From Swiss-Prot:
Enzyme Commission number(s) from the entry: 4.1.1.5
Protein name, as recorded: Alpha-acetolactate decarboxylase
Alphabetized Pfam families for the sequence: AAL_decarboxy
Function: Converts acetolactate into acetoin.
PANTHER family linked: ALPHA-ACETOLACTATE DECARBOXYLASE (PTHR35524:SF1)
Family statement: Belongs to the alpha-acetolactate decarboxylase family.
Keyword set, alphabetical order: Acetoin biosynthesis, Decarboxylase, Lyase
Keyword Lyase: yes
Enzyme class: lyase
Pathway: Polyol metabolism; (R,R)-butane-2,3-diol biosynthesis; (R,R)-butane-2,3-diol from pyruvate: step 2/3
Catalytic reaction equation(s): (2S)-2-acetolactate + H(+) = (R)-acetoin + CO2
GO molecular function: acetolactate decarboxylase activity
C-alpha cells in the first residue's frame, strides 16, 4: 500500500476572515506536519511561505525573513509534498492557462492537491496582508494591502488546490504563495506569467483539520458563515 499523504491545516480560513488573528501554533510544531505550504503570521503580519521544510515571512515592506521555530501562526496549511505528476512548461502562458493545464491532470475534482511550480516568470504580481489587530475583518484589512510586481524573476510557487465543497475551511481553487530564488521577494500570488518551469502536482489523501482548542476567542466566536464565505471570495 502506498504511503498516505495528509494535508495538515491549522484553524480555518473562515476564522481568519472573522478577525481571529492571534498566533496559537508555533512554526516548530507546524513544520512537523509538512514541508510545503502557506498561511499567515500572528496579527496577520504578512504571508507565510513553507518551502523545502523551511518557513519564510513575506512582509508588507517587501522583505523576506526566515522564521524561527518559536514564531506563532493563527492559520496555516502544510503537507509533506510528494509529486504524483511532474511536467515541464516550455512556452509562455498566463496563470489561468497554466492552472487549466494543471487541472487536466486531476483525477476528479473532490480531492485536495499540493502545488509546486519552479521557474522563470516574466511577471509576478503579489500582495502581503498588512499587520492588523484582532477583531478587524480581514476583508477590510485587505483593502489597504501593499501589492508588488517583479519582472523576469526566478523562484517557486507553493500552495494548495482546494475542492469547492471545502470552501470556507480554505479557499476553493488555488491558494498560492511565491518566493524568489534568492529569497528577497515573495507574497500571496495575485497573477503571473511563466515562460519556463517545472510543475509538480501532489496527491492528498487525507485532511487533518486542527483547531486552536485553548483559544477562548475562537471557541466562543459567533461566526456568520455565509458572510465569511463572501469575504473569502473578495479577499482571496
Amino acid at each position: 500500500m502506498s504511503e498516505i499523504t495528509q494535508l495538515f491545516q491549522y484553524n480555518t480560513l473562515g476564522a481568519l476572515m472573522a478577525g481571529l488573528y492571534e498566533g496559537t501554533m508555533t512554526i516548530g510544531e507546524l513544520l512537523k506536519h509538512g514541508d510545503l505550504g502557506i498561511g499567515t503570521l500572528d496579527s496577520i503580519d504578512g504571508e507565510l511561505i513553507v518551502l523545502d521544510g523551511k518557513a519564510y515571512q513575506a512582509k508588507g515592506d517587501k522583505t523576506i525573513v526566515e522564521l524561527t521555530d518559536d514564531i506563532k501562526v493563527p492559520y496555516a496549511a502544510v503537507v509533506p509534498h510528494q509529486a504524483e505528476v511532474v511536467f515541464k512548461q516550455k512556452f509562455t502562458v498566463s496563470d489561468k492557462e497554466l492552472e487549466d493545464r494543471i487541472e487536466s491532470y486531476f483525477d476528479g475534482q473532490n480531492l485536495f492537491r499540493s502545488i509546486k511550480i519552479t521557474g522563470k516568470f516574466p511577471k509576478m504580481h503579489v500582495r502581503m496582508i498588512p499587520r492588523a489587530k484582532s477583531g478587524t475583518k480581514f476583508v477590510e484589512v485587505s483593502q489597504n494591502q501593499p501589492e508588488y510586481t517583479e519582472e523576469n524573476i526566478k523562484g517557486t510557487i507553493v500552495g494548495i488546490w482546494t475542492p469547492e465543497m471545502f470552501h470556507g475551511v480554505s479557499v476553493a481553487g488555488y491558494h498560492l504563495h511565491f518566493i524568489s530564488e534568492d529569497f528577497t521577494f515573495g507574497g500571496h500570488v495575485l497573477d503571473f506569467i511563466i515562460d519556463n518551469g517545472t510543475v509538480e502536482i501532489g496527491a492528498i489523501d487525507q485532511l487533518n483539520q486542527s483547531f486552536p482548542v485553548q483559544d477562548r476567542k475562537f471557541l466562543f466566536a459567533d461566526l456568520d458563515i455565509e458572510a465569511l464565505k463572501k469575504d473569502i471570495d473578495v479577499a482571496e
